[in-house]
């Protein structure tokens, strides 16, 4: 059991569902989005909601987090703000990381961003695996730009244990 678990969720009605389902004192549920954007609005079920935002570093500082044993990110595109160069040294101290990287959008923005991450950020981690959503190891496919066009999102597993 973790000593403390933090859940960051941007959508207010999901917060209420989380509170009902989790109900444990060691789980802190925070409404917001981890991003470098100063403000975001999310449309969900025909509603638009302004969401509080904070950078990954601001989140760590605010909650006085200096050690993470396991990080799971499903940020719907915001993962690119977490896995940026300024956070790499801290991320490398986290023993296990599982994150979803989104590659889909209207103008190939995420595919271009993923290529940059693939070429510049991922090589800084010693043990990285990349899977399609059906569980197929596609790490080597993604080094070929042609294959990236076939994926909308991928799961990335980083094992930083020494």
Protein language model regions, located:
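Phosphate/nucleotide-binding beta-alpha loop and adjacent structural elements of enzyme active sites
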Residues: 1-162
């Amino acid at each position: 059991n973790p000593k403390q678990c933090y859940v960051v969720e941007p959508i207010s009605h999901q917060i209420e569902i989380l509170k009902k389902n989790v109900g444990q004192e060691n789980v802190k549920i925070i409404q917001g989005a981890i991003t470098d954007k100063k403000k975001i609005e999310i449309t969900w079920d025909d509603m638009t909601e302004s969401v509080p935002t904070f950078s990954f570093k601001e989140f760590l500082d605010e909650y006085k987090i200096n050690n993470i044993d396991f990080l799971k990110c499903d940020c719907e595109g915001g993962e690119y703000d977490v896995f940026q160069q300024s956070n790499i040294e801290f991320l490398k101290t986290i023993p296990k990381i599982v994150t979803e990287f989104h590659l889909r959008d209207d103008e190939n923005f995420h595919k271009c961003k993923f290529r940059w991450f693939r070429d510049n950020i991922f090589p800084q981690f010693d043990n990285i695996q990349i899977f399609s959503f059906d569980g197929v190891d596609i790490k080597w496919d993604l080094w070929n730009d042609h294959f990236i066009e076939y994926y909308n999102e991928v799961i990335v597993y980083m094992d930083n244990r020494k």
